[in-house]
């Protein structure tokens, strides 16, 4: 459910509400997760870190390029995963307040990185608020905002994909057009 919320997916319940377990019902009624899903920006999270079978996803909430973001530490594997996520990867700097949205509890203020263990087939969804926002150092094809995209080849310099081992999908987009609306 948390992954649906951070991805702004439609929230539908397809079960018998009379027999739903209390844990599941509590999760489906979690106001903080629902607020994340219904955030005014309506953005989907994108992958910023991928190691072995684990993923770190992030998105702006409340304000584009603001100090508050949502983060998912997603472990689809069969083993516990120890996450170490530098705040620079999340484009955040200074002291960062971290809140677990699933458990609805504050994890405190952190500096430098988030260190958490996530159990198999689980996710930790956090709201993070930083003292400052850092400039991104990597733009990836998976989440680039491309309103001027042209796949018909009619532009003089069409967008091209370029291999890049530092990108989670191992590819990035080049020649975005140099216009502000092309950047995430």
Predicted region positions:
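Composition- and surface-driven signal marking solvent-exposed, interaction-prone regions
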Residues: 17-20, 83-88, 110-115
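Aromatic/acidic polysaccharide-binding cleft in carbohydrate-active enzymes
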Residues: 1-38
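C-terminal accessory region downstream of the catalytic core in glycan-modifying enzymes
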Residues: 88-107
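Extracytoplasmic
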Residues: 92-98, 112, 118, 122-184
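Substrate-binding groove of N-acetylhexosamine-processing glycoside hydrolases
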Residues: 11, 109, 117-119
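Surface beta-strand/loop "capping" patches
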Residues: 45-68, 137-153
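Extracellular low-complexity, O-glycosylation-prone Ser/Thr/Pro/Gly-rich "stalks"
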Residues: 37-45
């Amino acid at each position: 459910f948390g992954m649906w919320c951070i991805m702004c997916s439609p929230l539908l319940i397809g079960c018998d509400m009379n027999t739903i377990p209390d844990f599941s019902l509590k999760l489906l009624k979690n106001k903080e997760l629902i607020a994340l899903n219904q955030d005014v920006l309506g953005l989907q999270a994108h992958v910023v870190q991928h190691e072995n079978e684990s993923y770190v996803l992030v998105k702006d909430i409340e304000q584009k390029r603001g100090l508050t973001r949502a983060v998912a530490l997603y472990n689809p594997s069969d083993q516990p995963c120890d996450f170490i996520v530098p705040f620079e990867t999340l484009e955040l700097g200074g002291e960062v307040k971290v809140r677990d949205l699933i458990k609805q509890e504050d994890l405190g203020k952190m500096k430098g990185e988030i260190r958490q263990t996530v159990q198999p087939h689980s996710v930790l969804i956090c709201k993070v608020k930083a003292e400052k926002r850092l400039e991104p150092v990597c733009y990836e094809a998976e989440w680039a905002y491309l309103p001027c995209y042209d796949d018909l080849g009619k532009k003089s310099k069409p967008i091209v994909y370029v291999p890049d081992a530092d990108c989670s999908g191992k590819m990035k987009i080049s020649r975005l057009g140099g216009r502000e609306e092309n950047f995430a």
